[in-house]
């Protein structure tokens, strides 16, 4: 443990067996348990960072937004690695980078469709990119790649 950090991966239920909001609820419950039992886990509660890649990045952001809305606690920071933030697939990078790469537009959309089921893609927890309530979140670090269909961000 050279960094002095403890890494805890929260497991969450997956689609298609478990649809929206199962994964969101699991992520929120998981971080609440970690925060509540931080001392027992050898974790400094003031340094808890939420991080995730792809769907995990999505869950990290929405979990922080839920914690903020509930007025409980906020993580020290968020690290979102090529996060899935737009279930509407309306950004240009979905079209320009959505074919001929490992992760295609259709692959991303089928994942959203399985998870969201009857929930609209415009739901604030399904497409957090379009939300307006980011004020008050901790610092957010977003990592993405040039040819990633998830690259574009709202300006």
Each PLM stretch: what is its role?
Residues 1-153:
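Alpha/beta-hydrolase superfamily serine-hydrolase fold, recognizing
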């Amino acid at each position: 443990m050279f960094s002095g950090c403890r890494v805890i991966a929260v497991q969450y239920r997956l689609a298609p067996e478990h649809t929206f909001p199962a994964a969101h609820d699991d992520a929120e419950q998981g971080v609440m348990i970690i925060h509540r039992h931080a001392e027992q886990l050898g974790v400094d509660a003031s340094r808890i960072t939420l991080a995730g890649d792809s769907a995990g990045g999505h869950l990290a952001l929405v979990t922080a937004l839920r914690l903020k809305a509930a007025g409980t606690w906020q993580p020290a920071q968020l690290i979102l690695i090529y996060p899935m933030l737009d279930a509407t697939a309306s950004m240009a990078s979905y079209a320009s980078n959505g074919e001929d790469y490992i992760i295609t537009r259709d692959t991303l959309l089928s994942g959203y469709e399985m998870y969201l089921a009857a929930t609209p893609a415009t739901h604030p927890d399904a497409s957090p990119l379009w939300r307006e309530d980011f004020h008050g979140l901790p610092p957010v670090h977003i990592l993405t790649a040039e040819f990633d269909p998830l690259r574009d961000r709202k300006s």
